[in-house]
UniProtKB/Swiss-Prot annotation:
Belongs to the SCC3 family. The lineage of its organism: Eukaryota, Fungi, Dikarya, Ascomycota, Saccharomycotina. This is Cohesin subunit SCC3. Present with 4090 molecules/cell in log phase SD medium. GO terms for molecular function: chromatin binding. SUPFAM superfamilies: ARM repeat.
Amino acid sequence: MTAVRRSTRIRTKSQVIEEDYDDEQNTSAQHVESDKITAKTQHEEEEEQDTGESEESSSEDDYEDQDDDDYVDTATAKRKSRKRKPKSASNTSSKRQKKKPTSAQKSAVSHAPAYHRSKKDQDQYLEIAKDFQPTELFDILSTSEDVSIEELLREWLETYSENRDKFLQEFINLLLNCCGSVARVEDHDVHSNESSNETIGEIQLLFQRQKLHEFYLLISKENKKRKNFKMGPLYQNFAEFMTKLLEVANDLQLLYVESDEDDTQIVTGNLVLDLLTWLSSFSVCKIRCFRYISTLTLYLFQDYLTQQAVNLEKNYLAKLSKQLSLEEKKKRPNNKTLEKLESTIAETQGSKVVIDSIIDNIVKLCFVHRYKDVSDLIRSESMLHLSIWIKNYPEYFLKVTFLKYFGWLLSDNSVSVRLQVTKILPHLIIQNHNSKSTDNSAIRQVFERFKTKILEVAIRDVNLDVRIHSIQVLTEASSLGYLDDSEILIISSLMFDEEFDPFKTSSFNKRSKFLSTVAKFLARVIKEKFDEFIKTHEDLPKEVDGLEVGPVVQVGIFIKILNDSLIYHLKDCAEVDSRTKIRMLTQAAEFLSPYISTHLKTICNLLISDTESNELIQKLQNSANNNSDDEDVDDEELDITPLFPIDRNSTILYLNVFHGLCAGANNPKIQTKDSVKEIVLPLFYDLLNAASIESADILCPLLESFITFSLDDWISIGYETELKKITDKTIKAFMDSTIGNSKVDMKYDIFAKFIHHIHHFEKKELQEKFLNQIATLKIHLKKFLQEKMDPNNSRDDYKDLTCSLYELYINKLTILGRDYPIEVDEELLQLFLNNFVSRIPIMFQDFDDSTAQEINFKMLVLLATWNLEKWREIIEKVRDYENSISKDLRSVWKPIAAIIGRLNTLVISLAATNETFENINSLFYLKWSACTSLMDIIVAIKIFELKLPADATTWRYSMSEQFPFYLHDNASKVLLKIFLYLESLFAKQVDVQLERVADEDANLNDLPETGFFENIETEFLLFTVKLKGLMKLNILDERFASRVALNKEKLGPLFKKIVDDTIMENPEPNKKNIQKAKSNQTQREKAPLQPNSERETDHANTENNDPDIPMTIDLEPIEESSQNNSELAPIEEHPTVVDAIDNSDEITQD
């Protein structure tokens, strides 16, 4: 094969200077024909857009599928083997394959351990390596952490003039040692640069025959942080060695020398020509590690050369030229000085020309090929060092010619390459923007060309890190005005991406980092738009009605852009309910808190003040209206007209943003909590007083904001006394409100959270207020039951009466009873059981679905569990409880027995009610609600019994006397029917054909859809957990258990674990089991039902029902109680029995 030697091209200076990129590329292509393997064709789209530039980048595009005989992973090897099959039929490939085996046969995985090879290969490798000794340079670089690289280089470079062949021999052997090659060259092998290709070819064959390889340089790079790694310093020392090599060579006058033909001409030194010749031959080798190390070495040379070129220009040529100019301006210039200055300038210019020539050759001989190498490591190194060259030498590299490579590699199929590119681009934009000496037209031109691709990567890339850094690129670009309004909306709307579920988003994961990055982008946009607005409204006053104009306008613009971004996000989405919109808006505000929380005082003042009469706001609104009348606004144009809380919708928007900003301050990484509480807490009561809190949409974000602050926060700023006024105001709203079912009424959850939060303050005066409300509610409830629900009076408004009963009394008592003890006298209990509970089967015919969903028996569970809790505390405190407590324990158990008996009767009566297609769902819901409460009470009683001291025989006897049975036989049958119903609904959802026993109802396969449950799987599994608890307590028999387990193989792994009693297993704490547990935890996170999946985070405004997940904590020890009661600790795990049982509306707590 005829080829033009690279050394010849380098020595021919006229060619180097005169030939353009295309001519040099064609010449290089002839020489590097063996590098066909390394080409990549990722940039076809870009090359089609610019055919002139495509000629530079496509010289190797036809070579992509050739053999690459170095380290490839298994997947790559398979892919390559598939690509090579058609080519193996060709004559050329066949001949090549006869000479040597294919790459899949002869190369190992990169730095793979020896046991990946056959015993024969290992023995052969050990035999070869037995007498092998690495070079002295390699030994020093790989083991010495404190070696003086400059001294080492100086001593070594001095040998070049004495013995050039030995010097090159040591240099090449150093590279080979770093690649793990046992082959080495002798001095006669490197005597002639003309034979460099042949020599490299022989080395390549020897390397392939070695079979086992260790790429020590790359291993050192990837393990540099590991302690006690034997070659830890190799990569760092090697990089410093090659970076300083030309610097020391320059000190020794080896970088450029005077020409032999013309003493005044400066030419490239022989050392550089030798190094470039051999390194360029290595860089087109088919061995990947050879290409990597030679490319890295050339790039490190270039790092120094770009610095030196600028150094010569700024520190020598500029100063010398200035001295020359000053000397020439003198009246009597000194001719000798002028001659000396001119001579020095000419010599320095000659040196810079040589350096520019070397830089140019490294680009042409290496970079333009290696930036699209088959190895993503080499492609990444190419982009990394190109950014260094642009930073060092912008006059040469900050051009479209080089910047386009970043745009092309945005489409790279390797995540690491795309990530490298997106990490570099923001710094390039910042560097260019801050530099006064360079023109930013190249950056602008390249950004405009690849802007669409950057946006696409930011929105759709499969790797979250790449998306994060792409948005950082757009953030810097937005500051320079490179983004249109429509493009700003595209990115800012990512704040509301439904993919980032609040259950998955936290301050410690990548999703959170993504939203934080978008928040930073949005904050930058808001600042830019504010500056733009102020420039166009210079006539605005500084202050109006006590409000500073600047912060008010900035807040208005922020709210407007945030609102427009949400609207844009929802434009192409399916219909989203209001709760989801609020959650998305609040979450966005949380992540914007670090940038916007300083404006919380302005937001509070706007919400407190009368915005309708504010002169400034009216003026801005009139200006906005005039602008909208004069111009047609595009839907995708970013409207920066400030938005203020002038109506109900905008007030709700402001309050939810206010809540998000307060919640975001709780992030410990932000450290704005102190400043936020000093702003918000003094104004909170005024805010609560000014707001229309009778509306749930306004009340919820306000109380959510209150919950984000602890008692210590109030005490630290001296506003603890405000808590009494806030509590009074909230209690009044609570008592005046009608509170419906928690699934449909947001007030249910927010009042429950507020009361729970105040309860944790442990302030007696505040707790007494809630206890007083319980007493008041009981009085009004008794009156309502006597007057409105008298069974002797025939009425036709049972539906409305039932809703009123729950909305005015039962739901409120249930909310209060979760934190404060509820005790009712026998009369009130009997009124509720007789006048309402026992009459439900009669009133049922007047109920619709919404009324049926309103009914629950949580208050009965609370009454029973608080009663048990009271006696448990007495038993714990009193030593001689057998004698000190009345022997007649009938009064203790009478109310609980009445509740259990009435719920049993209700369940049986509902089961006897005639089912129709219209009422089947509501009837099932009532039976399910009664059964779940009944099971909760039974488990609470059994826990109480199991926790009794061993000598409490009187208590145990009285319990057996008062509770001859817990569950009636007919009620047990109802439990089974409910299980079958839920099982059928879940099977229908997952499209599973169930097995059934002979006497089961065939209609269970055709049940209508029910809207009572948000998640059928959750309710089905939780009900199964309750049933398993009763089975462990021997309340349900084995026949029941066998039917529950009938379809355990078909209904998912979690159901099977519940049935098999393996869901709460705790493996031995050894390393192997810990790793297994982590794996299982990962699987559980992906499962449809998660133990915490129903617990709402602070991002949400509502909570889902979580009926009895904590029950599993209590049920598991029960099985062990027959052996050792001392191991039972369900009560101690919860403050009260109430907490252990009544979790049907459990509030998420920090």
